[in-house]
Every structure is written in structure tokens, then in C-alpha cells.
Amino acid sequence: MTDCFDSKEFLKTVTSQPGVYRMYDKAGTVIYVGKAKDLKKRLTSYFRAHVASRKTETLVKNIAQIDVTVTHTETEALLLEHNYIKLYQPRYNVLLRDDKSYPLIFLSADKHPRLAIHRGAKHEKGEYFGPFPNSYAVRETLALLQKLFPVRQCENSVYRNRSRPCLQYQIGRCSGPCVPGLVSEEEYQRQVDYVRLFLSGKDQQVLTQLISRMEEASRLLHFEDAARIRDQIQAVRRVTEQQFVSGDSEDLDVIGVAFDAGLACVHVLFIRQGKVLGSRSYFPKVPAGTELSEVVQTFVGQFYLQGSQVRTLPGEILLDFTLAEKDLLASSLSELAGRKIQIQSRPRGDRARYLKLARTNASTALVTRLSQQSTIHQRMKELAKILNLDEINRMECFDISHTMGEQTVASCVVFDANGPVRSEYRRYNISGITPGDDYAAMSQVLKRRYGKALDDKKIPDVIFIDGGKGQLSQAFDVFASLNVPWDKQKPLLVGVAKGSDRKAGLETLFLAAEGEGFSLPPDSPALHLIQHIRDDSHHHAITGHRQRRSKVKNTSALELIEGVGPKRRQILLKYMGGLQPLLNASVEEIAKVPSISQALAEKIYNALKH
């Protein structure tokens, strides 16, 4: 207990109802969020003569203020607790650092339903399938579905404005519901039903229906239809034979945990309709002295409750540990999902094998992460020594990319004590400068980045500038002109110049805008760290520049082609199904567009390719 916090007086005001409490330090920062069935009883436990753990003892010493929020039920308290944890990211809570929503496959409720990748809240009417471990898995599945079932994947804006079928129809990837007469309502709906069954894991039902239709077509002597359905059957069989299918068709999330050297790894295995869709490893931030059961308990709550609007809840969750609040979590998730959600910790049979697999993956991922951290920590320590710093907790690096001065993009990448912090990587579109003036570009991005109030934790110890003394001089000038509330003297500015032939290992470092720089040995761990952050910055800048250049080029290229006016541009985009299919089209395919001659098709093709 601190001198400035009177726990006895505070506890006199606390109710015995359920609710959530927030603990603050002297600076007014939330350091811990908790919930309780009985607030008075729970908060009193913090101020006994003997507390439960060293972690709690350290927490109590830092308390300067406590706020409480009373709720109607314990379930409400649980939901509010995890929302507050997400909002405040308190130092003494276990924190799930990756809160990105999972991608899903969306089947719309339109007259002619479309398939699409989806992230975020489920506002649009339709059906959602997933979750998938990453967007690549969704795109791969959508591409596969296009080959198996010709259901449209175009945007409604394109679909509504078509009068002729697009390229996807011509290559057999879409049945063309946009143009009357190409496919019957019954046949299109049948393909949509196949998609629905396939995504629900009911492959055998799809095959049974297709086989029945093929036999019927043969009986009626419709051999072309029978051959087409036969090809579809073979394609579906090839896909289903490649997938591991359990005898159990339920939806499961399997959560395995590993812990070592103060670092925890939680590995989630996603199983839908008996198929392993994929998995993902998480490394939650764990305060010292935290029990592993608390890590699992908090992870499950944050993982499902914080992302409640965007995650697809399975019917059952298998865990590595027995949770103290298992029933409360299960009832809260069931209430959220509108159906029963079970939480199991002692599975048998296939479920036990799944849990063992998740546990093995967690251990493997943890070993890899510890190895990477050990290397990063060694390099950080070596770099701090070379730069005469006590320690380095945060570094940022800047690079500029452009082509002949056009579409200039600056990048900023961030490393902390554990390596890259990719969620904080940023790109800046540079404008209002003389084309090709890298000094002005660097000056602009530094002013935009640092010419404002910064949280103490966001002030870097080292700022690397990709370039020689000229770029570093610009950085010094910018920092000299800053009028900010934080200590602008804290960051050490370092220029990184490549050798004459730009080979790795020949970099020269500059700590001042004048005088000679110095180089590090090629095998120096500190140099390897500098190369890592510099290369990340360069890649981030050039990727952003290419995206910006491509966007400008693609939108303006059609306008620059002689003989292609607004009307022809509209016809081209409508016929091809958008700009991307047009970019991928051959001369022959472009020539099929109404009012486009062979000569003009060649001109369009060459203009878009070069």
C-alpha cells in the first residue's frame, strides 16, 4: 500500500455487488484491471497483511487510486473486464498482443449470391464460414471454389452494370448470372448449395448429389452435361482426398500452452467439420510471477470476448488446463453465441491427439521464439555498447523510395528489445517537395513523425537514418527546430551509409553531420542488427512506393492510350470485369471486347504492360 492511497477508507465505500475494478499508479496510468463476483471481498484481499504472491505485492505497492464499475451480473463483469484490458493494456495483466480478426469466407444473401473474403463485424446479410488462420488460406480456398463451383466472386457494383459476360465466364470460373440466359436460376442456386455444403465440410453430400445428377443426365442421353458433371465430381474428389478428416464432424478450437524463461506461447488449432483448417501461435505478455493457469484463463477470455464481434465461436474449446472460472466463461460465450459452447480440459480419443498436437506446436514455437530473442538481445547489448548507451529499448529507422522523384514514399520501422514491432511500422506519402529531393523528403517525414507529443514509451533511444552525412544533417536540423513537450535530446541520431558498391558489410556509420564515420567488422552482431532494421525499412519503403506507383500507373494508363476515350474505357472495364482482369488479359482476349480492333487491342496490351 502506498502513502497516497488509503485502502481502509476506500474499502468502506465499496459495494458487495459484481463488477470491475481499475487500479492506477501515481501517473494516472491504469496498471491492473480485474473483475469480481463480490467487489468488496475481492478488493479487501489485496490489502491483507500477507498477500498471495510477489506479483500482487508489487502491484499493491504501486496503487495510487482504484475505480470500480458495478455490473448487473458476473457475465457482464467478465465482458467489461476484457474490454478494459484491451483498452488500457495494463502492465500487470496478461496481455494478448495480437488481436487481429480472423478472415472468413462470406456467401452473400443476394439473388445471385457471391463469394468473398471478409474481415471485421458481420454487418452484411449472408453466411460466414471459417475462421481461417490467414488471408492466404482464404484466397487459396476461394480460388479452389472457383474451379469446383462456378459461383460469382465479383463486387455487386461490377455485377449490376454488366451486359456481357466477363473473362471469368469465358474460362469457366463463373456461370455468368449477370447476363440473362447464360445460366438458369435453378442451376446457379444448385452451385451455391454445393458451395454451402462444401464449406460446411459435407463433401460426401456434394458428391452424392453430383453423381445422382450425372446418372440422370446419362439416362436422358444428355452426354455433354454428364461429362461436365463427371469432371466436377473428379475435381471435388481430388480435393477431398487431400484433406485429413477426423471421424468427428464438430467444430473445435484446441488450445495448447508452453512456458519457459518467462515467456509463454499459446497455440490455437482450428478444426472445422473435422478438418484442420490451420493454426496460429500467440505470445501474450506475462507479468513476472503469474501462474500458468492464469495465463490460459486470461488468454481464453481476451481471445474470444474481446473479439466477440468478429470471431466465429466453435461448438467446443479444448484446453491444456482446468480453469477456475470455466463455467462462467462457458456460459458467457454461450450467451454471446446464442448456442451452447463447451469448454473441456480432459479430452479422449481424437480430441486428446489434437490437444497433444497443439501442445507440441506451442513448445516448438516457444523454442524458436526464445532462440530468436536470445540472438536479438545479444545484438542489442552489443549495439548499446558500441553507441555508448546503457541500454536500447526502442529503435526506429527511416528510408525514402521513389522513381525519378515520382510517388515518393518514406518508411519508418520500429524495433523494441525483442525485435521488429510490425504493428507500428508506418509509411508516409511525401508531397510538396522538389521531385527527387531526398533531403526534403527526410525532413518532411521526421517533422511529421516527431513534431507532436509522444508517450515516453514511444520515444526511441536510437533513430537510424538510411543515408550519409547529408541525410543525417537534415535530421539534426529537424530535431533542433522541434518544439515538443518530450525530451528531444534523448534519441541518438545515426546515419547509415552503404559502401560504393552497396554491398552488405561495407556500411559506414555517422554519429555527427561532420567528420569521419566508422565501420564495424562484417561479423559484428551489432552490424547485423543495423542491417536488419535498415533492410526492413528499405523493403517497407519500396513496397509502399511500388503500390503507390502501380495505383497511379494503372488508373492513368488507360487515359493515355490514343483511341481509348471515356466510353471505350467503360466498355473495356465492364466487359473484362474490372482493371485487374484487363491487366491480366492477352491481346486476343482484349480484341474480343466490342469496338476494340486487333490493332487497338495490341496498343492497349502494350501500354498496360510497359
Swiss-Prot record:
Keywords: Cytoplasm, DNA damage, DNA excision, DNA repair, Excision nuclease, SOS response. InterPro entries: GIY-YIG_endonuc, GIY-YIG_endonuc_sf, GIY-YIG_UvrC_Cho, RuvA_2-like, UVR_dom, UVR_dom_sf, UvrABC_protein_C, UvrC. One of its GO terms (molecular function) is DNA binding. SMART domains: GIYc. Residues 204-239 form the UVR domain. GO terms for biological process: nucleotide-excision repair; SOS response. It comes from the Bacteria. One of its GO terms (cellular component) is excinuclease repair complex. Disulfide bonds: none annotated. It is found in: Cytoplasm. CDD domains: GIY-YIG_UvrC_Cho. Residues 16-94 form the GIY-YIG domain. The UvrABC repair system catalyzes the recognition and processing of DNA lesions. UvrC both incises the 5' and 3' sides of the lesion. The N-terminal half is responsible for the 3' incision and the C-terminal half is responsible for the 5' incision. Interacts with UvrB in an incision complex. Belongs to the UvrC family. This is UvrABC system protein C. The lineage of its organism: Bacteria, Pseudomonadati, Pseudomonadota, Gammaproteobacteria, Enterobacterales.
